[in-house]
Curated annotation (Swiss-Prot):
This is Histone H2A.Z-specific chaperone CHZ1. SMART domains: CHZ. It is found in: Nucleus. Pfam families: CHZ (PF09649).
Length: 172
């Protein structure tokens, strides 16, 4: 077993030793990669170099336009004011149209005029109150506190003793 391990190690070491042909091909590859990397570096430098934009031509054009407008200055000012007024009117028209659209989308039949929501049913509360009085169902909700105490006693453990009510005169 130990001999097999030594043989494997020697084989691996022998495989790692470079041949003369491998050395030559590796040297060629490294030289080619160096040339390619320097060429890429030069290309990158030239791409990074940017000239500052020359605005002098633009300035000259603007100066010429200003001179031309100075001769007809009054007419242009009136035109610009009327354009501004037109824009304001257009914006106001658009706003009014939007408001009208909002109001047209609202269905007045869905507006609740009373303070109670009934999920679409129209209820006359006066009539329902009269019907409840006739049936004797008025005042049912008044006795809720007593019902709660009765329900509590029903659910209590029968083996557990009931707590004695505390009297206001006894010291705590």
């Amino acid at each position: 077993m130990a001999e097999e391990i030594k043989d494997k190690q020697e084989f691996q070491i022998g495989a790692e030793e470079p041949d003369s042909s491998n050395v030559a091909s590796q040297a060629k590859r490294s030289a080619e990669s160096e040339l390619a990397s320097t060429a890429d570096a030069n290309d990158k430098k030239s791409k990074k170099k940017r000239r500052r934009r020359n605005y002098d031509d633009l300035d000259e054009k603007i100066a010429q336009e200003d001179k031309a407008s100075a001769t007809s200055g009054a007419n242009k000012e009136e035109d610009s004011e009327s354009e501004v007024d037109d824009e304001k009117l257009d914006q106001m028209m658009v706003k009014e149209d939007e408001e009208e659209d909002d109001l047209s989308e609202i269905d007045s039949s869905n507006i609740i005029t009373t303070g109670r929501r009934t999920r679409g049913k129209i209820i006359d509360y006066k009539k329902t109150a009269e019907k409840l009085e006739k049936n004797g169902e008025v005042g049912k909700d008044d006795d809720d506190d007593e019902d709660d105490e009765e329900n509590d006693e029903e659910f209590k453990d029968p083996a557990a003793p009931a707590p004695a009510p505390a009297s206001p005169t006894e010291p705590k």
